[in-house]
Amino acid sequence: PPREGHLVKARYMPDQVMVTGVDEQGTAHHGLLSQPIGSLDLEGMPVVVADLHSSLPAVLAGLRSPDGQEQPRVAYIMTDGGALPLAYSRVVATLSRAGWLAGTITAGQAWGGDIEAVSVHNALLAARHVLRADAAVVIQGPGNLGTETPWGFSGVACGDAINAIATL
């Protein structure tokens, strides 16, 4: 079916998709996210960055409050280092149904989140300012890549996420 929006994800692949991004011109949050660099930040929102998608449940369990207390609003940001469609993650589907996630954001070439973003930077800002998350977790989609060389594994992208957090 035709999709609205102008962001193309999985570009030049036979199954590329067009989505509406939170940061796209003409959308409700474009004005917010188009503020000058330095005028919008994470407002102290804690962010956990991890490499393995399978670590998401453990990270979320660590962020949860004791029973009977209000639970934090946690956003999951899926980067494009693993599988690109969020729907490939049974873990996210289970955690969403359980109410452990305030929302999902797919960044870069990944797609299928509650919110789509062009970059990890805008995904982080959307987590805080659109989803009103108390915390965010940045982890690639399911599946990772490695070549047994010091720099040849998909986990090095965690450094890119940390740089985005430090910048914001």
Model-based region annotation:
Residues 1-44, 54, 58, 67-75:
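Extended, charged alpha/beta regions that create polyanion-binding interfaces
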Residues 49-51, 77-79, 106-107, 138-141:
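Short beta-strand segments
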Residues 62:
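The AdoMet/dcAdoMet-binding core of the Class I SAM-like
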